[in-house]
């Protein structure tokens, strides 16, 4: 709040998922009618063999899982039901929203990028689904958002989870090095999903090679203090 006058724009992302989402347990059953436990990984050959039976069209699901591998996306993992459409869990964290609201009262506008409503594809990054789907423009790369980021000199990046949504947002910008070079990644304003600490290391290493900066919030605020005085 103390340094909010230096912020020109705040862009938040909000995940929203249906209960019957391809990454939720209810979407899947095995031959015994059991749902997978959270953090189970499912491959296309396990669907082909009948080990896991999807709620959606089997052939389309197999194609989706194959394309994850072909496009070097993360393995398909089952998560606990989260960010359910219309429920409290899909809302922006209240303490963050309070700070954003105070900032907006100074005559500024924030933006919320909603993602994840198509139940047939994961949507980690802010710009596109893990596998964009034909017939759903909302799953394809958000060029408007990328173009807006290009209008700013410095872009602070933070959020949850470091290993998944933040990392994939970063990776989806690798085709736009001029944006990556403007990024300041706030390392102490994010955390990994437990057990996935090493998953995104190559992404962050590549971002550093491309010119992204890594800072803590304390160092960032201290640098802003010296710039102002």
Q: Which residue ranges define each predicted feature?
A:
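Active-site-adjacent betaalpha module
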Residues: 2-11, 17-229
């Amino acid at each position: 709040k103390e340094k909010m006058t230096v912020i020109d724009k705040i862009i938040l992302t909000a995940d929203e998922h249906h209960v019957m989402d391809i990454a939720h347990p209810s979407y899947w059953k095995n031959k015994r009618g059991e749902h997978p436990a959270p953090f189970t990984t499912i491959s296309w050959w396990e669907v082909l063999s009948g080990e896991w039976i999807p709620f959606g069209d089997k052939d389309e699901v197999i194609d989706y899982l194959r394309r994850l591998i072909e496009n070097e996306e993360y393995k398909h993992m089952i998560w606990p039901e989260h960010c359910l459409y219309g429920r409290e869990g899909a809302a922006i964290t209240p303490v963050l929203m309070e700070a954003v609201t105070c900032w907006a009262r100074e005559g500024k506008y924030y933006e919320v990028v909603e993602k994840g409503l198509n139940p047939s594809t994961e949507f980690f990054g802010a710009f596109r689904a893990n596998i964009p789907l034909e017939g759903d423009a909302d799953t394809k790369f958000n060029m408007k958002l990328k173009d807006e980021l290009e209008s700013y000199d410095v872009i602070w990046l933070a959020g949850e989870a470091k290993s998944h949504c933040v990392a994939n947002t970063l990776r989806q910008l690798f085709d736009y090095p001029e944006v990556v070079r403007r990024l300041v990644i706030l390392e102490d304003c994010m955390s990994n999903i437990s057990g996935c600490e090493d998953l995104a290391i190559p992404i962050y290493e590549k971002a550093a090679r491309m010119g992204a900066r890594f800072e803590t919030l304390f160092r960032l605020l201290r640098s802003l203090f010296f710039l102002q005085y």
